[in-house]
Amino acid sequence: MRRAIAFLMILWYYSNYCMEIARGSGVAEIAWEITESSEYQKRRREIVLGIGRAATREFNPESLYRLVDRYVASGVADDILKERGDTDKAPEDKILKLILKFIQFMPYWICAEEKLESYRNGVFYERNNKIREKETVVSFNKVVRDIISEGQYTRKSELISDVQGAMDCLGYGDEEIENAYKFLAYVINGMRHEIAAEIALRKTKGVRAVYTTGIDDDLAGIDLIVEYKDNYGGEHIIGLDIKSTPDSARNANNSDRDKGRHAIWSGFDHRRGDFGFYEDNLMPSNKAVKRVRSFYETELEKIVRKEVSRHKKK
């Protein structure tokens, strides 16, 4: 009963002050509100007492105490999401839901990123473990993408700074925050190129529809699915893997790839100021979108010719 009342109080706060939160600092502010909730305090107290009872001379509980805040906050965020269900009545509700998902995923995402980095550096891994870590990362990336798309933040530095504030509130150490900065900067850059590509493609001649993909397609290397009608009236479904540079697209296409899936540069160039003079904007300029449309017209026709040629050889 008391637990239900605690959740209702949290939900009441968000429903009454959601507009203020949506215009405020977002992730850090909501993380702080969670840590101030009675449900969070109760869970944390129980876990800390359990750690204290389990501690021995050979086991220093301090290292575990630092982990408690982030996972308790993650659990509370998860429960609030379950309590809310599908209640996106207003844009502010959707933003709140995304930020709660962000806080829910964050400790698992950082752990997954660190493990994947160790695998790249030669640490032995089992294939199933690597797939599981990738699924966690992709799920988190999609939350970041949605937060950017909703316009909660306008600048990359603003979003990263707010996340760092949330991490500080949730007991992360300096080294963990530094690692998260590196991982998050990479994620944000990739997601803003995906969003920019989607915006430009929707305005490109011959493009009938553009769809963002689910986790399975993303893991298979498909970020966007495009319905395209070529210059001769032929209709095509094209899976695109959006890359932030021409070199990364070229390298991806030179590797083994399933047919019908194509890596392509987003067409947006930081050096040209497509994401602002300081490369800090999360959304591309209208001028850049207009320029990139012609780039996609050319690239989509190239992809179609390549696919037609491949089918003729069968």
Kindly give the residue locations of the regions a language model identified.
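Catalytic cores of nucleic-acid endonucleases
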Residues: 242-311
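Charged, low-complexity, intrinsically disordered terminal regions
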Residues: 107, 130, 134-145, 155-167, ...
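Short glycine-rich, low-complexity/disordered patches
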Residues: 210, 313-314
